[in-house]
Amino acid sequence: MGVFAAGHLGELTQYLPVELVDDVLEQTKTTQRRLRELPSRVGVYFLLALGMFPRLGYARVWDKLTAGLAGARRPSEKALRDLRRRLGPAPLKALFEVVAGPLGQPRTPGVCHRGLRTVAFDGLHSLKAPDTRRNRAWLGRIHYRMGFAGYPTLQVMALVETGTRALLGAAVGGADNRDEPTLAADLLDLLRPGMLVLLDRAFDSTAFLEQITQTGARFLVRGKSTRKPLVLRHLSDGSYLSVLGGLKVRIVEADLVMTGADGSRVGDRYRLITTLLDHHRHPAGELTALYHERWEIETAFLALRHTILNGHVLRSGDQPGLEQELWALLTLYQLLRMAMVTAVETQPGTNPDRASFTTALETARDQVTAARNIHSADLLGVIGRAVLATLLSPRRPRFSARKVKCPTSRYLNRDDGRPARTTTITTIDVAIHTPTLTTTPPPRTRHHRATPLPATRRARVIDLMNTDPHRPWNGTELARQLDIPPHNLLTQLAEWTRLGLLTKTSKGHYTHNHPPTSTTPPTT
């Protein structure tokens, strides 16, 4: 195979054949202009291997790819870095878009609910990036109540098939695009009639829900407690009909109380809003149980950030590198899911959630090192047989404390009655509540602020700069006059410059791009 020898991913190459990689490289115009020792095809598989071995450096990952190949030369790490830069993120994104999509057959347990394929939107905000100037300029820094996060984090929105945890699509946002419904709107074209979208309260926006309906898909969303929906008609299962804007919906209001084997009890009230209007075909109690499937997307994210990455920070120090790395990671994840679902569906009646992601990943790693089954026609293969040999027991209902070991996290100390250890749930009591009928919307009351909101930091900075708008202002000088920590302000000045609000005239000096034309104070 010569220079193409390292262009493989072990047995997973069957799901990402070299012909597909070459075609994507040609379409994205990233095929090498002349044949080198490191052709573009090899670069694609090398990037996927970087995601498979996140704790290893470039040279060690190359050694994994060539361990089963006699006489393969190791290039320098600089040559491998140059290969990454030459490829860019475009071919990896295109590859992900090719392999992304639903994997489960409608007959496979857990894939569909009464003929509707269940999918879910959610955001992943815990993939850490190196703390470099370029990454901070793109991603910003998250400010918690007790300080800044140690690393910038990627903002990833995903659409997942809950039955198999396969990815249907993903979108990436920066510091100026952290809103989950806005990111999810970029993925709405992936929805189809025959899909049921499960959503948490962050997506309870009438405009966003109307957009979902326009795709032909149905939805089941947990509504915010601040909503005051009309109760237009009571239904026999305890739910009721209502409207959101011009959208006809059905609402289930239920109290859930879970009792653990240790006697602990945890409860919460749920307001579920759906476009499944037939209460005979989709009774309220059934929808309440179905909403739990939304958490399958959290399990998918767990596999990404912990099983694959094992908590490691990503490698890249700038936006193109991070995007390239992310698309490679998502592609690798999808290939593993393809192998797992292929294996599970050879045993009819087996739920895909019984397949061990850890088993699939570790077996795939072994196959990369051995360089085996690259061109085998056996799709079940070593990975599939390992998955079937280690099927997990059917899931049992459990709960535990929601706690994150991070002093700046809002989940550091939770006092919601959940037990400290994972506890089996013995009973789940569901009480459906039906509110009183209403025919007119509740009157809106105007809330007058007793005192105006304090000026934002950006407004204070711009106000000060506008006192002398024609001279460059030093960032440290601004911080001193406004009594702001210098390192915090300098980071924000760089971000405002990227957004076009300021111009950097020299090192550490800035001018406001829109000096005032009236006495009206600037707004943010």
Question: What name fits each language-model region?
Answer:
Residues 1-58, 86, 95, 115-116, ...:
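Single, function-defining residue in the core of a domain
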Residues 40-43, 454-462:
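Short, leucine-enriched amphipathic alpha-helices that occur as contiguous helical runs
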Residues 52, 466-470:
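Short helix-capping/hinge SLiMs at alpha-helix to coil transitions
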Residues 75-140, 213:
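Active-site- or DNA-interface-adjacent structural scaffold in DNA-acting proteins
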Residues 450-458, 474, 504-524:
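Short, cationic-aromatic polyanion-contact patches
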Residues 470-481:
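Short acidic, hydrophobic short linear motifs in intrinsically disordered regions
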Residues 484-495:
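Short amphipathic alpha-helical interaction segments
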Residues 500:
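Glycine-centered, phosphate/nucleic-acid-interacting loop/turn motifs that mediate DNA/RNA or nucleotide
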